[in-house]
């Protein structure tokens, strides 16, 4: 995505408002380490496929080892997004997600960060006292084996 990359806004999430989100700006945040125990726990609870829950079977998979569920990866992304990008004082929720893709597997030991591009900011047509911020979020993987 185009835009100037910065590691922060002028304001922290504790004092960030609609006007602080500038269309075209790019921000990088993170990092969070993917822990094997958490991959196994999440897989067992929510996505019990062999390459998420069984290290030996996962070695024989196309991935060559244990990988995090895409939903686990999405949850880790959401943690970074919530901690660093979303306003803590003015966020009223989200109208949804346009697209979600998993392009690369995430392995235990990888470190994730996010790059967020502000695609659009606009006033709500139905509630003009509120703003809508459309963002493009990428998960960056350091240590990726794939």
Task: Name each region found by the language model.
Residues 1-22, 102-146:
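HotDog/MaoC-like acyl-thioester-processing domains
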Residues 2-96:
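Hot-dog-fold acyl-thioester-processing enzymes
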């Amino acid at each position: 995505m185009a835009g100037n990359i910065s590691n922060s806004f002028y304001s922290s999430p504790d004092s960030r408002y609609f006007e602080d989100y500038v269309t075209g700006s790019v921000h990088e945040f993170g990092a969070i380490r993917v822990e094997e125990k958490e991959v196994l726990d999440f897989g067992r609870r929510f996505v019990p496929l062999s390459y998420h829950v069984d290290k030996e079977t996962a070695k024989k998979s196309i991935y060559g080892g244990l990988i995090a569920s895409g939903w686990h990866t999405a949850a880790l992304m959401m943690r970074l997004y919530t901690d660093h990008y979303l306003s803590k004082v003015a966020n009223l929720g989200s109208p949804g997600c346009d697209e979600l893709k998993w392009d690369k597997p995430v392995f235990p030991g990888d470190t994730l960060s996010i790059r967020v591009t502000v695609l659009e900011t606009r006033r709500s047509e139905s509630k003009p006292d509120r703003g809508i911020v459309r963002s493009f979020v990428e998960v960056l993987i350091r240590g990726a084996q794939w």
